[in-house]
Every structure is written in structure tokens, then in C-alpha cells.
Amino acid sequence: MDMKHVKYLALVLCIGNLSPVMAQTASKSLTVDNLVAWQRISGQSISDNGKWVACKMEPWEGDAVVNLYDAQGKELATFPRADRFLFSASSDYLVVSQKPGKMIVDSLKIKKTKKDKLPMDALVIYSLLGDREVIDSLKTFKLAEKVDWVAFQKGRKDSTLYVQPLNANLSTRYEAPAVKAFNFAEKSGMLYYITAGDKAEEKPGLYLLNTETGVKTLIKEGDGVFKQVTFDEDGANLAFLYCAQKNSCYKAMSLWLSQQGAPATEVVARGNQALPKGWVISEHGKLQFSKSASRLFFGTSPEPRQKDTLQLAENRPNVQVWSWDEPVQYTVQNYNKEKELKRSYQAVYHINSGRICQLADEELSQILLGDEGDAPLALLSTSRPYSLSSMWEGRTRSDYYTVSLEDGSRKLLASADYGRYRLSPQGKYAYWYAETDSCWYTLSMADGKKVQLTTPVSFLAWDEENDVPDYPNAHGTAGWTERDESLLIYDRYDIWKFDPDAMKEPVNLTMNGRKNRISYRLVKLDKEERVVDLNKPQLLKGFNEVTKGNGYYKARFSTAASPKELIAGNYMLRSIYKAKNTDHVIYTMESFEQYPDLHYATLDFKKSIRLTHGIDQQKDYLWGTAELVSWISLDGRKLEGVVYKPANFDPAKKYPMIVSFYERNSETLFNYRMPEPHRSTIDYHFYNSNGYIVFNPDIRYVDGYPGESCYNCLMPGVAMLIGKGYIDEKAIGAQGHSWGGYQVAYLATRTDLFAAIESGAPVRSEERRVGK
């Protein structure tokens, strides 16, 4: 038994000693073993055609299972010991990798079985017509995103690559020996692989395989080192780094490019005059094509210093030297050492003209590209000059520049600015929220014109409930509209449309959020969508601050209008995914008493089908309820919190109670709180099931007095519950972790109310916490 189980067993024993046994006949109390075995949804997917849904159920310890469902909610197939699962591009297949059983592997490890003798994974290719192909001894696999093909390797000592269609009736299949790496293009059936070759037919090098035509092309022959192999989006172009000296300590990389499946040519060689003097192509810099594939971005860096391989390691000096006035603390330098050694600076190769331009350097190292790399200007920034002052200011200033992707020329936009600039999708504007004045700004990349979009009087952009000794955060943005014409900004409740040049008045698109105290937020269902289309219907999620319930709403942002309610109530809605080619969605619905089972519906939510039945796990166990309560703090503020009561609650009885909290949690009234043997907090269902009440009060802070703020908020809440007559005043405990751990430790110095207090990983020193 591990320490986690030991600790929870101790809690079970404590419960047995401290609380009376609840008189129950039909139901049982949860145990630690129940928590460990509790099945949760750890993954879900809907096919592109919306006809099939796969869901992964997984215990906290043990083997997961993937279940396949059709649109009527019928379970079609089950895949035990499941790991990864993916639908094919055509939606005709489900591919599932399976692990060997955990108990079997654990027993073999106990017997000291060698690693190469342990069982391997398997790959199941399941046709949605019912056929099943199983590939044993799986090492790794990749599924193409746009065609029904899979590539895989199997066997520990065999590095042969197998590439085949998912349709087992097709005889087409390709094999390549001694393959080191492989991958498919994002939007085509093109596959690259790197092989050491064999003595018969396959030369060593980088190959391109067109799975749709069967044509295989040797892109670059060589047994050297290949790095950063990258397709453009459509798979028409392929770029990579190559060094022929595979056994040298330092890999002198050059940049190669293959276009339209032709053999690759070297486009940026080592020592290219366009690179800064003494700089080289970095093997750690990410290769990236622009959206149009007219530009190829790569990383450069100063040539790294080489170790003296003629000197023994024990004869090398092993000292660490730093000075008191360094702008970055030595501990931070030491922590980031490996990251800094691999740091690279972006450059661009213009494919059509062959020109090379260095964009970033050591002085201006951070870069943001606009329009997926096709914008004429990029945004450069650095916080290097302000590293020292950031230690006591608590935030970092930055300098911002535009840089031309054509010639590398730079123009200063802002100096010593606290804002974190971002780029609009097409790269026409930089935009940011200024914490120091709680306003949103834009800046034209073309002419440097700065525009203030909001003022503290005209628009409440900030967190109105901020209660920490710092500037309030923004509520964020919903995104940009097409052609960078408008920026959609959230306030506490609504979504507003702003003209980035402030030539038009802002428009409240959702209109009634603040009036009804519903916080609307845009749900992005298409992961590839870069902008918000004002003419398309949009899905919003709404949170009701009064009831704590959730809903989905329909809106169309072409005109301002109150969103149309689709589904809303006293529950939590989340984990929504849409089929790519239809309006079908999957989502979860939950409350404290209702398991977050997976549901299937169309976007109007008129008919919803429950697919999974995780709630069945509860039927044999005592299950508590959640209730919203309110009271007045000692300093006169109205507060809310949640009381979790045991099953079959009897107000005439006295119950032991645990107070557990972390800042504000009343908005989680309808969270299921998945049963879990957690390392840092109590499990609410476990304690409810064993006869305890759990109280989670909201804590609102006054600057400089976090502990006393906790006392002022929590104590009258506890008194309010005691006043109801069902709390055993001699059996009240408090539990908190980290920031909550600090506060329960403070409570121990202010009151004798609590019979026991557990303070987990508490903040021991406010000075040290600020220093971090």
C-alpha cells in the first residue's frame, strides 16, 4: 500500500472514531478503495460526420476503457486497456492503441522481469461496419489527418516502418527499413520518413511517400543528422536541417528545402553571409512555413562554445561564478540554463526570391508573426533592460518594435511598457490590456498610431471583484472579426465590439448580460477558425451569478441582440466538442449529485441523448447534496458559500463538519467534484458519505490582512450554520492547502473553535512568497 492509501486509511479510521455510524440499510459509505477505482471521463471525441462518439473512462489507478457509441446512444464496441484513440478522416474507422494490463505489468516488474521482456502495446483498427484488425507489439504509430492511412512501427528491436490504408481489404502496403522518424502532412496524405537504409534497395536519407499515388521519392540522401523536418500545411513543401558529420560534437546545420516532391536543395548553408557574423543555424529553432508557403522561418544563434574533449572531466574547473549586481538572479539563471543554451533567434528565408533576413537577435529576442507568417511586419520585444527592476516592481516592462520581414528594418513602437502586446490575426494591430490603468489599447503596425479603446469611466474592462493587492486583471477578449475590422472585448457580463481605430462607438452585442447578471463567453467550436464571423450564428456559454447555473445560448453578432437561450438550468455545462462537418456536438452536464456524463445533441439542444452512464457508480453509495448559503461578514459584506450535506440529512441531528476553502468557490455550486484520493484536499463525497457536513465559504480579502480577512469571512459563516442547530460544535475541523493552508494556520492562532486543523503546504513567509 502506497503512502496515499495509508493517509486515506488513517482518515477512514478517524471517521470511525469521531462520528456516529449513520443508520443506513440500502446504501454504503464510500471508502478509499472506491475513490481509487472511481471512473472518470478522461477523453472524448466525435467523428467529423457526427455519427460516432468515442469516450475514454479511466480510474485513478488501473486500466482505462474506450467505448464507441452511435448517434442513437447505442454502445457499439468496447476497447479495454485503452490509451490513445482517434477517428479517421473519413469517419469510417476508429483507431485505438491498447496498453498491456497494469496488474500484469506490475506483477512482472515485481518479479524483476527485464524491460525488453515486458508485454508491448497493440493497435486496433476498428471499422465502423464492425471489422477489426489488431496489430501486436506496437512501438509507435501516426494516423493521417486527411486520409485513411496509418504508419506504425512494431517490435522493440525492429525499426521497420509500415504504412498502410485503414481498409484491410486494400492490399496496398509499404515498408521501409531502419526508420528513425516519420510523420504525415497536416492536410494531405504525404508522409516523410528518415531511414538508415539497408544494404539491398533502400539508401540512407529522407524520403517522401505520397500515399494517394504510391510514389516514393528520395528527398535527401545521407546518413547524417536530420532535424526539424517540417511540412507546409498542404504537404507540397518540405523543409529540414541537415548535418553530414553525425559523429561530431557540434552539428553544423544547413537548411534544405524540397518543393512539390522534388529532391531537396540547400537554401541556407553554414556561414551564409546573410547571417550575423559568428552565427549559425540552430538545431533547436523551430522550422515553420507561412500560411502561403512563400516564407520559411528558422532559428539561428551564436555559434556555441565547444567542450574540450581532450581534457578529462575531473580536470575541468567546476565552479559557478556570479556577481551581486547581475540583472537576473543567479538561481534563475541556473534554473534556465538548459533553456538558454538552446535559445534561438528567428530568421526568414523568402522562398520565391531566395533572400534571407535575420529578424530577432539577442537584444530583441521575442517575436510574434502576423497573418500566420504572411504579414509584412512582425512584432519584436524584449524585457532584458528591465530584468533588475522587475524584481521589486512585481511585473516586467518591455520594449516593442516592428520588424520588416522583407529587409529586417526596425521601428520603435513603445519603451518600458508594462502591457503584454499581442497581434491581431492579420497582423494589422498590436493590442493589449494595461493593468496600470485598466484600459484596452491598440497600435497600428503600419504607422505606430496608438489608440485608447476604453477608459475606466466608459467601460469596466477589469475584474470588478479583484481583492488582491495588485492591479486587477482584464476579463479578456473573444477574438477579432474578419480583416481585423473589430476587436471583441469582454466585460464582466457582456461581449462588446470595438473599432480598433476608435472611429466608431463600441457596441454591446449581447445587451442583457449585466441586467440579468449572466456572464456570456464565446465558445470556439472550430479549432482552425482564426476570426469571429459576425454573420454566422455563435454559441455562447452563460453563467448566472445569482443561481450559479449555466447555459448555452445562440447569438449572431451582425446586430446587437439578447442571446437566445438554448439550454440552461441548475447544472454545470462544459467539455463541448463539435463534429467538423455537421452541427452535432458532445458535451457534459453535471451537478454535485449528477455525474458529468457525456451527452450528444445538435446545436439547438432540442433533443439530447445521454451516452455514458458514469452515474451508475453512485447507486450503491450514500451521496450528499449541495446548498447555497449566505451570511454577513464581520466587516459588513454579504458573502456566499456552499454547504455539502450528507445523504438522508436530518436537521434534528448533530453532524461533524469540516471547513474547506480556497478564495471564492460559490460559483462551483454545481460542480460534480469527481471522487478522487487527492494529495492536497479532502474529497467532499467521501466525507459526506461518511456522515460529515462540508462547508466551503467564499473569502474576500482586505489588502494587507489576508489572515484576518479569512477570519472575518469564515467565522460568521460557521456561526450561521451552528445557529441552524445541526452542527456538532465540538467536532468542527478546518482544512486548507497552500494559500488556504496559510489561512487555516492563521485561524489556529485566532480561535479555539476547531477541534482539528490540517494545513497542507502552507505559505510560511509572506516575504518569501512575494520574492518568488
Role assignments for model-derived ranges:
Residues R574-K772:
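Serine-hydrolase catalytic core recognition
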Residues P20, I46, D308, R673-P675, ...:
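Residues in and immediately flanking transmembrane alpha helices
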Residues M1-S27, V763:
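Bacterial Sec-dependent N-terminal signal peptides
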